[in-house]
């Protein structure tokens, strides 16, 4: 859990993914298209990835454990939450408040 929280605070937006996950790619692409330089951490490329995956599952309280997005060091959620925030017009203000967007 400590490693997840440490990584989550390294940048304004941190996304935990799996390289083979299509929804992870979709969420990562959304942030890229918005102009956000997110830190993408692929759990299947990390020797401690399984341990972090379990920690993320514990934080979320449900599965699937990826993608998981942190904004401003705070857990926001997975695909459904990010898409809901985006469609509701709440994601961009959240990104601006975290310093991930300047426009």
From Swiss-Prot:
Gene3D superfamilies, alphabetized: Glutaredoxin
A Pfam family reported for this protein in Swiss-Prot or TrEMBL: Glutaredoxin
Motif (Responsive for interaction with TGA factors): 100-103
Keywords: Cytoplasm, Disulfide bond, Electron transport, Nucleus, Redox-active center, Transport
Disulphide bridges, residue numbers: 21-24
Record's GO cellular component terms: cytoplasm; nucleus
SUPFAM superfamilies: Thioredoxin-like
Protein name: Putative glutaredoxin-C14
Annotated gene: GRXC14
Organism of origin: Oryza sativa subsp. japonica (Rice)
Family indicated by similarity: Belongs to the glutaredoxin family. CC-type subfamily.
Signal peptide: none
């Amino acid at each position: 859990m400590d490693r997840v929280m440490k990584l989550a605070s390294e940048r304004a937006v941190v996304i935990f993914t799996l390289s083979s996950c299509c929804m992870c790619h979709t969420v990562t692409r959304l942030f890229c298209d918005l102009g956000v330089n997110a830190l993408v951490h692929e759990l299947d490329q990390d020797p401690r990835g399984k341990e972090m995956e379990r920690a993320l599952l514990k934080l979320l309280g449900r599965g699937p454990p990826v993608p998981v997005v942190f904004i401003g060091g705070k857990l926001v959620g997975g695909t459904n939450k990010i898409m809901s925030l985006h469609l509701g017009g709440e994601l961009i203000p959240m990104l601006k408040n975290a310093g991930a967007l300047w426009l």
